[in-house]
Amino acid sequence: MFEGLSEKLERSFKILKGQGHITEINVAETLKEVRKALLDADVSYKIAKDVTNNIKEKALGQKILTSISPGQLMVKIVHDELAELMGGDHAEINIKANPAIVLIAGLQGSGKTTFSAKLANFLKSKRGKSVLLVAGDVYRPAAIDQLKVLGEQVGVEVYTEIESKDPVSIAENAVKYAKEHNKSVVIIDTAGRLAVDEQMMDEIAAVKAKVNPHETLFVVDSMTGQDAVNTAKAFNDRLDFDGVVLTKLDGDTRGGAALTIRSVVDKPIKFVGLGEKMDALDIFYPKRMADRILGMGDIVTLVEKAQEQFDAEEASKLKKKLAKNEFNFNDFLKQIQQIKRMGSIKDLAAMIPGMNKISDEDIDEDAFKSIEAIIGSMTPAERENPKILNGSRRRRIAMGSGTDIVEVNRLIKQFEETSKMMRLMTTGGAKKMMQMMSQMRRR
């Protein structure tokens, strides 16, 4: 995500490396590169110029503390400016009413229908809401079928009127149905078009006027850059929506839409889509996104994802097993599967400070597959008691998993080291754990 922008900004900060003071000359050199990085990210010239002018004003007015280098100060100023550009504080979706009506708008191909299902899943699983999805696209039967399939995947009812060609009537009837069936949120997926046109605008404006939604969200494909921003402006001028959803953000290396859409339409980005899976949806936090752009990671989101996957009761059981030295490959496999559910290795790595520099070639998304294959080739007794894994058993496991003995031995070694480290963490041996980690690094 935004790899190109991150690399260019990092290079621009190197101009200040070794400099004792911030001066007009070195600030000008740095900001020339920052402006170029923003323009390459598909940020408009006016916004790039405004941002760099703000940074210059703040940088030249700062006093350098002896403990902070000019480069560090510049990173902090750029971070704050990027966060402010993307909206500052995050904005919550308004679902206080009962039922809360959420209207979804956007161009065809923006990921609107997929987002509708993701939002339903999010509100059901993380907010405890009873959700009704509404198929309001009367022009594309495939869109109705898609929403029905996705609704089934996430366990959410989908309201349809197959014979009707009136989206206003469908939306009105769906809200009545939701009230009769005690639904707490109604999500209305509307028709998309290949381009902005008057018929589309009139239609969705009529739906909005009839059902009076508590939240209107505009969905855009972040990979379309300034086109996404221009489309959002055209919609907002007519529809006056409440927030933006950026889809396909995981494939966006530039970041122009995320950086500029707020300043153009004066509406917050509320959600971002990060993949095809139904749980690949995140609340948008401008400050956390600025952290990730500048290679500072996003530990808060990483911890939140971990908390969603790791059950407190299971963690307590695991702690007891570790204390008794009973951690086995069944437990190890369970931990691996929980980590997998948190997201792709690439996305998780981007949340760890400094890990954004790791190239795609160094990230093996299939690494867990071979681990699962090796553990799957063990007998129940071997998984329960790893101490019995002698040479002949390891050769059999390698053959059964389609790997080689080196990979099997490596996994067993990793298992043993993980077990020791986790045991030290649970028994309070922090000092011993740090010594062990330093020894592992020296190998």
Region spans (language model):
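Residue-level recognition of specific faces of alpha-helices
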Residues: 1, 15-18, 37, 47, ...
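Residue-level signature of catalytic and energy-coupling elements of molecular machines
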Residues: 16, 42-44, 78, 107, ...
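Amphipathic alpha-helical interaction segments
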Residues: 29, 33, 50, 54, ...
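Short, small-residue-enriched loops and turns at beta-alpha junctions
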Residues: 110, 139-141, 165-167, 192-196, ...
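Long amphipathic alpha-helical segments used for membrane anchoring, targeting, substrate engagement
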Residues: 2-19, 288-443
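Conserved phosphate-handling catalytic cores of large alpha/beta enzymes
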Residues: 171-175, 179, 183, 195, ...
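Primarily NTPase-proximal linker/entry elements flanking Walker-type ATP/GTP-binding cores
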Residues: 8-136, 143-164, 171-190
